[in-house]
């Protein structure tokens, strides 16, 4: 029997029998909204980097924060769905604008960093998402406390580094932060499943969690690649 003649059953690979059909439909809405956020964020980044019509700064950061709070304060219902999708799109757009300075920095170092970082982030996000979907339910929820503690330590060290100015601490924050965000992809994905199983159908807010995970992963991986590229250029000189 030739093992190469065996057919791969893709339906079996995509079958999540431990997740109820209603939750699977909920996840489809979450990831459809996530895809929308990615396109709108790309448009926001384009506006900052290419057209310079809207620049990243205090106003764009405050705008994204206000939209996020507004979205949180607006209850999920059929009547408010279109309004909340508009708020989600606005938040994603301003988040993309906020990526502008980091994108410009990477372009000055080496433009090839951007597609490399995006593809790397997409692969990491996809792998950890599938791991969370295929794993036994609630198996990664124990990470919540660990991840929040690690995030608090990263925030404190980042604030402390404002005064110390240590490049080593900055780099350590990037690498540790990358690992922590991978953990958040696992945790948030399974948390969304559990919330949906218990009746929480707010797919728009659930999308926010995954979108922020992806953006933070992308930003950290992009900066790691840019700093490594700068170090290589210094060594050549």
Swiss-Prot record:
Report membrane topology. Multi-pass membrane protein
Instruction: Pull the Cytoplasmic topological domain ranges from the record.
Output: 1-29, 74-86, 134-139, 188-206, 228-237
Which organism is the protein's source? Answer: Pongo abelii (Sumatran orangutan)
PTM comment: the record says: Ubiquitinated by BFAR, leading to proteasomal degradation.
Q: Upper taxonomic classification of the species? A: Eukaryota, Metazoa, Chordata, Craniata, Vertebrata
Residues in the membrane without crossing it are 207-227
Q: Which keywords appear in this protein's UniProt record, sorted alphabetically? A: Apoptosis, Autophagy, Calcium, Endoplasmic reticulum, Isopeptide bond, Membrane, Transmembrane, Transmembrane helix, Ubl conjugation, Unfolded protein response
Protein's cellular compartments:
Endoplasmic reticulum membrane
State the protein's name. Bax inhibitor 1
